[in-house]
Amino acid sequence: MNCNEHESTKLNYLNSLEKSRDVKTDISDKPKYFITFPYPYMNGKLHLGHLYSISKADFMSYYKELQGFNVLFPLAFHCTGMPIAALAKKLGEELEGKKTDISTKEIIQNLGFNDVMPFTDPVHWIKTFPKLCISSLKTFGANIDWRRSFVTTDINKYYDSFVRWQFFNLKELGYLSFGKRHSIYCPLDKQMCLDHDRRKGENIKPVRQIMFKFHLHDKILLVRQNSIGKPYKLVCGKSLEVVSFKYNNTSFLAEKIIFDNLKYQINNVKYKESLVLSMDLKDGLTYDGTNIEVEVIEKNILVVKTDTKSDVELYEKEIKALNEIEETLFTLSTSSEGIVESVAKLSVENTKDLLVQTKHFISVYIPEKEVISRSGGICVVSLLDQWYIDYSNEKWKSKVKKCLDNLECGPDTRSMLYAGIDWVNKWGFSRSFGLGTKIPWDTQYLIDSLSDSTIYMAFYTVKHLLFEDLEGKLEIFPSNKLSNDVWDYIFAGKDLVPELYGYLDLLEKCRNNFQYFYPVDLRVSGKDLIKNHLLFFMFNHVALFDEKYWPKRIFTNGHLMLNKEKMSKSTGNFLSVDDALLKYGKSATRMCLAVCGDTNDDANFVEDNANLFILKIYTFVKEIQKLNELVRKKSENETIASYSNADVLLLETVSVNVTEALNAYNSMKYSDVVKFSFFEMVNLINLYNNINGTNILLKNLVYKSATQLLYPIMPDLCRTLIEKYFDSEFNLPEPKLKTNKMISAFEYISELIKKIAASKQAKNNSCVKIAVGKNYSEWKKEIFELIDKIDCPRNNEIKKNKVFIASLLDSVKPILQKSKINITKGNNFVMDYLVNPDKFVMKFNEYEIINEFKFYIENMSNKKAILEEHCDAEPLNPIITFSK
C-alpha cells in the first residue's frame, strides 16, 4: 500500500465518523447570537477563498452555541447586477460565432456542464448555482439554517418588495437625488461600471484632466496641464497617436484617451481621423498668451514657458471659473424633472451640450487607471443621468461614526472604516442593464448590486415565515399582499393597516422574530468590502433602524493564497470547495483553514498541511479510542487519593490551554485556537508520558477538553467523539486548576536541560553534577530588604523615573562596595529585582523538583545526573559541572 492509499484509507475512516445535522434556529428563552456573511455571487461554484471567509463566521457560530447562545447563521445568494446577465449575453454571442475576449462556454464547461445552451438565459444561472452552493456548504458542515436562504432580484417577489421598501424610505428621508455625474462607464454594456462589475480596476475613480490649448495651424492642440507656472513640454513623433475631431465648428487634436472619454461627456463631438503627429512643432504653433518663450530641444520636442505673473494670475482665474461652471452644471436635483441653474442657465438634460472650457483651458474626465468591465470593455468616463444615494450627507455621516464608535472591530479595519466615512460621496445606484429590483418611481432603472445588499440581514429573520423555497414560489404569506405596509409593521414597528388584519398572527410572528434576533452581532467579510459594502451596511442601518438595531461587531480577513501563490484558474493554482473537501475531507480542510491566518493580511492554504492534518487528526482519534478502552476497564468507583507532581503539571497545563483557547475564540484568532486546543494538548500528553505520568483518567480529561474545544473547528467529527467516547453534553471545558506552581517548576527543569545541552563541556562528558543552593548571598539579601521597603510600582514603568533610579542605585552602592561586587553587575541585579520581583520568589522546592525529575533530565540530556546542595550555589541558579 503506497502513501496515497494510506492517506485515502485514513481519510475515508475520518469521513465515516463525521456526523452531520440539520440546523433550525427559532426563537427561544436563550440569549441570541446573530452571525452573517456577505451572500456570495452566483456566477459560479464556491472556491476555497469563499470558504476561508465563511469559516470565520462558522467557527464562531459553533463556539457561541457551546457558550449557550441561540445562534442564527443564515446565508442567501446574490444574483443582482451585471455579471450574470453579461455572461449569459456573451455566451449567446459566442454560440452565434461572434468573437469574445474570454470564452464563457469554456468557463461553464470547466464547471462541469456539458450542455451550455441553457446558460444563455440569466435565470438558469440563478436556478443552478445556489443549489450547488448549498450542497458544498452542507458537505463542509456549515452551521447554517438553510430555511432562511433566498435569491435576490425581482425573480423573488418578496425580496424585490423588501428592497423597494428600503429605497422608498431612503427617498422619504431625503437621502436620494437625481442628476448628472461623471462616472466610470462601459461602452460595451452601455452603463455605469462600478467595483463589482469590473474585471480590473476596483476602487478606480474618475479624475479631472485640465487640458491647455495650443493653436497648431488651423487646429487647437489639447495638452495636459501641468502645475500653473511650470513649463509645458510638447512631444511629437512616431509614438504620439492623436485624434482629430470637431466640436461646434472648431477642430481639435488630442490624445486618443482624451477623445475616447470626451465623446461620452459632451454631445456634438464629430470624429474625423486618427493620425500620428509628426512635424516641426515650432512651425505653425501659435499661442494667445502675452509673453511666451519657446525652447527647441529637438525638431519634434520643445518646451513652452508661460510663467509671467500676468499669465499665472489669468490661468488661476480661468481654472477657478472652470470649477464654478462644473459645480453649477452638475448640481443634483431631487427628481428627474428638476431644473438646475447654471452659468448658461441650462437644464439638467442639456448639460452634455456644453464643453466646459475657458479661453485657455478645457476640462475632461478620465479614469485614474485602466478599468476593464467583466464584459471585457475598456471603460471610460461618461457624464450620466443617475440616481444617487447621498452618502456625503454630513448629518448621516455623523450617525455612522457614532455607530462605529460603539462597534467592535480590529484597529486596521476601524481605521479604514473611519477613513471611508470621510471620503465616501454620492453613490450612483441606478443601472440600465442586468438583474435586480427596479427603482419603484423610475422603472427604467435597476438598483445596483452594492445598494440592494445593505440591510438584507433583517430579511433573514423573517424569510422562513414568508415563503419556503429560494425564489418565493412556495408562498406562506401571499405575495400579492406585499407592500411597504408589511415591512413597516415588521421592521419599523408601525401599526398594521386594516387590509392586513387577516394576517396579524403571521406578521406579528415576523415582527417578534426580527425583534428577537436583531441586531447583527457579528458581520464577517473579506477586507475588500471595507471600502464599499461594509460602509454602506452601516450607513443604511443607521438610516433605517433604531439605534438598538445597529450592528455590534465586524470582523474582516485578507485574501487566501494557495501554496503561497495567488489563486488563479488560468495558472491552475486553484481549488474549489468541492475539490478541497474531496481531497482532504471536511475536518482536515477546516483545521487547515483555521491556521491559515486571522488578520487582514493575506492568508495561505498549504495543501501539504492539509494532508498532514489528515494524519494528525486520525492519530488523535485513534489515541482517544485506545484510551477509552483503558478507561472502561477501570472501576467506576475508583477515585484518586492524591495527585503526583506530574498530575498537577498536567492539570495546570490543560487549564492554561483551555483559558488560552477560549481567549483565542473570543478574539477570533483561530490559529491560536488550534495551537492550544490541539497541538499543545497533544504535546502535553507526550510530556506526561515522558515524565512517567500514569493516570488514565487525567489523560482522558486532556483528550475530552481538546475535543470539546475543537468542536467549533471540526463539529461533525467532534460530535461523534463526544457522544461515543466522552458521553458528555456539548459544552466548553473549564480550567481545573488556576495555580501554576508545577508549570513554573517544569519551566525551570526545561531551562536547566537547555543549559546542560548548551554547555561546551557537555559534548565529551557522560555525567552532569547539579549543585543547588538554599540561600542568596548576603549582599543580595540586603538589596532585597532595601527595595522591599520602598513603596513604588514593581514593573517596567518605574524605569522611566530617572531621578528615582539614580537615587536607588546610589543607596545600594555601599552594599556592593562592601561585598566587592562589580558595580555594573550589582546594578543589573537591582534593576532585575525591582522590575521582576516574582522571578526571585521560590514557588517550589528546587532540590525536590530536580530530584523528582532527575530521570527526565537524564533521558533528555543523555547523561547521568548527580544532585547535591552547595553553599556557593544560589536559589534557581545551580552550578553545573561535568565529568566523565
From Swiss-Prot:
GO biological process, one term: leucyl-tRNA aminoacylation
The keyword Transferase is assigned to this record: no
Sequence motif 'KMSKS' region, residues: 566-570
GO molecular function: ATP binding; leucine-tRNA ligase activity
Motif ('HIGH' region): 40-50
Pfam family, one: tRNA-synt_1
Keywords: Aminoacyl-tRNA synthetase, ATP-binding, Cytoplasm, Ligase, Nucleotide-binding, Protein biosynthesis
GO cellular component: cytoplasm
PROSITE patterns according to UniProt: AA_TRNA_LIGASE_I
Assigned EC number: 6.1.1.4
Reaction(s) catalysed by this chain's protein: tRNA(Leu) + L-leucine + ATP = L-leucyl-tRNA(Leu) + AMP + diphosphate
Top-level taxon of the source organism: Eukaryota
Compartments, as annotated in UniProt: Cytoplasm
Residues annotated for ATP binding in this entry: 569
PANTHER family reported for this sequence: LEUCINE--TRNA LIGASE, CYTOPLASMIC, LEUCYL-TRNA SYNTHETASE
Family as reported in the entry's similarity comment: Belongs to the class-I aminoacyl-tRNA synthetase family.
Name of this chain's protein: Probable leucine--tRNA ligase, cytoplasmic
Source organism of the structure: Vairimorpha ceranae (strain BRL01)
